[in-house]
Amino acid sequence: MVKFLIVLFLFAASSELLSQQTPSQRRADNTALTTLLLKEQKEYLDSLYLYSTGAWSDVVNGRDYIRYFFRSTDKPLLRSEEERSASLIFKKRKYDDLPLQYDTYTGEVIYTDNKLILNNKICEVALNSDNISRFDLYFRHDTMIFKYFRDEPAFNLEEGFYEVVHDGECKYIIRHISTLNLSDGLEKYPYAPESYIRVADEYIRIISTTQFLKLFGDRSDAIRQYMRREKIRLRKADKHQITDILKFYERLQIQAG
């Protein structure tokens, strides 16, 4: 009950503050106000409770996930309209059949529990990532494997969750991210994934075909011919086609001894 009253108070306070502003002030302060309200709400909720839900009590702990993008025309949730199941590895133990989503703006794994209702809304929890080493999203025609990269000597990118697309002699990962853009007083979160490949010592972001081919050194001509033969255009290539290129390169390396 206390939890409900605090959340109700916070939203009432935000509505009162908004009503006292002029339209121009609301547009100008939109982002700052949203950030402030979310910060205050999370601080209160974090100090009150951690979620603990039945069989998943070890995994489902974190803070209340507030849909901060309510003023946006899009959702920074990865493939949110597609049905999926999910699993994750928490403290080296695997948990299956979890209702998970991934926030591409905050980089958080979101758990949705239809049995937890607060303020007439289904509760969502932003899971603590400290003990999550991996989570998988299973779509109808695709499986996405995410690994949390942290404190790894050979990893030269920002720590966080990356989709592991290929993990052979070559490495191929994707950082699924959204950025915040303001336009006409509205917040937008355009989705802009970044692809990285490691052929030698470090991960390099794929930017252009020329730069991509240079990664393969003296095999670049063979890779170019393979791409022409398979009619692969890098700008339009999906992750499966890029994986095929990497596998072809690995076969060349094996044949060369």
Give each language-model segment a name.
Residues 1-4, 20:
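Positively charged n-region of N-terminal signal peptides that target proteins for export
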Residues 4-13:
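Sec-dependent N-terminal signal peptides
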Residues 15-19:
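Sec/Tat signal peptide C-region and signal peptidase I cleavage site
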Residues 20-94:
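General N-terminal leader/first-domain-start detector
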Residues 67-70, 77-210:
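Aromatic-patch recognition
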Residues 210, 214-257:
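Long, compositionally biased interface segments
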